Design a protein with these regions (language model features):
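A short helix->loop->beta-strand "cap" motif at the edges of active sites that frequently abuts
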Residues: 3, 60-65, 162, 219-222, ...
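Core AdoMet radical
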Residues: 8, 46-47, 114-210, 221-231, ...
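Short, charged, surface-exposed secondary-structure boundary motifs
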Residues: 43-45, 57, 73-81, 111, ...
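Ser/Thr/Gly-rich flexible loops in soluble cytosolic domains mediating phosphotransfer, phosphorylation
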Residues: 65-91
Length: 311
């Protein structure tokens, strides 16, 4: 009788890359693999968690391996033999895109980001041939443009006419400082609009310059997506949101949370600001301070979805 493996995606039902790799690897070892059921027992269980504030399971039967950024300091890192296994996309039958990391790490040392501690300085991780099995691709790289290997892989993506989304965002400072990279990105077929980040007002100049270069070389769609990190300085976030509106960019606000703390520790004003930015009917028609100070701010409670994400 074959051994069995249970998989737990603790955060959500969104496709989990690590679990897909684990599934593929253990299937080659003859294991029967399925998503975890509390009514069954398994020879081995893998649990993956992205966010530290997501409640863990109270009880795991049998032998459990825990991994992911949500387990700060205690996460198991996948060994190379699993890390470089093509993901088992059959775990998510409706998934119409491939997923993976071309590079790991980053050249930046942002104090709010766990990547420098978790992955170190930027380095090549995998050729797209290792994990691409669809015509659509979601790359999870943190700073792919900072790597020559990453740029070579983008060329390969272009040549193969793969639609791609770098869903962690592209470094606006690199784009702003190198028109050749803006030209390269203009040749990409985008699965979703190109993403950048403006985590503080000091990054505004780079985002504006990058936007101008990208539009100059006709990188489309031209309404680029911009992550806004929202800390306690709401004035800073408000100024950044205003620039996004001025330059016709599409902002998405994320309330900053120290990863060692609970999501409950974010402030009400952080939440209100994220609601204002992310519920577009408000962002386009009402100033934040009017939204904050009038009954309008109560309207979002009737809308589906929280429209706020801790980062």
């Amino acid at each position: 009788m074959s051994k069995t493996l249970g998989l737990i995606n603790i955060d959500s039902k969104i496709p989990n890359l690590a679990l897909m790799k684990v599934s593929a690897f253990y299937k080659t070892k003859g294991y029967g693999v399925e998503f975890f059921s509390p009514f069954k027992t398994y020879d081995l269980t893998y649990a993956s968690k992205v966010f530290s504030y997501t409640p863990d399971y109270d009880y795991y039967p049998g032998n459990v391996v825990k991994g992911g950024t949500g387990y700060i300091g205690n996460a198991v890192v996948l060994p190379d033999e699993i890390e470089h296994t093509c993901p088992d996309y059959s775990l998510y039958p409706d998934m119409d895109y491939s997923m993976g990391f071309i590079t790991r790490g980053c050249i930046r040392t942002c104090n709010f980001c766990i990547v420098p501690d978790k992955e170190g300085y930027i380095k090549p991780n995998a050729d797209i041939d290792e994990f691409v099995r669809h015509k659509n691709l979601v790359c999870l790289d943190n700073n792919v443009l900072a790597s020559e290997f990453g740029l070579e892989q983008i060329e390969k993506i272009i040549e193969r006419k793969i639609k791609v989304d770098f869903n962690q965002g592209l470094d606006a400072r690199i784009i702003a400082g190198n028109p050749d990279i803006a030209k390269l990105l203009s040749r990409v077929k985008w699965l979703k609009p190109l993403r950048m980040a403006m985590d503080n007002i000091g990054e505004a100049e780079a985002v504006i310059k990058a936007t101008e270069l990208l539009r100059k070389y006709n990188t489309t769609p031209k309404r680029y997506f911009v992550y806004l990190l929202v800390k306690n300085d709401i004035e800073d976030a408000y100024a950044r949101a205003g620039l996004c509106k001025k330059y016709e960019l599409n902002p998405f606000a994320q309330a900053y949370l120290n990863p060692k703390l609970s999501c409950k520790n974010i402030t009400k004003e952080q939440i209100n600001f994220c609601k204002w930015v992310n519920v577009k009917i408000f962002f386009k028609s009402v100033d934040y301070y009017d939204f904050k100070d009038t009954r309008t701010s109560r309207l979002y409670k009737s809308l589906k979805g929280e429209s706020v994400l801790c980062f």
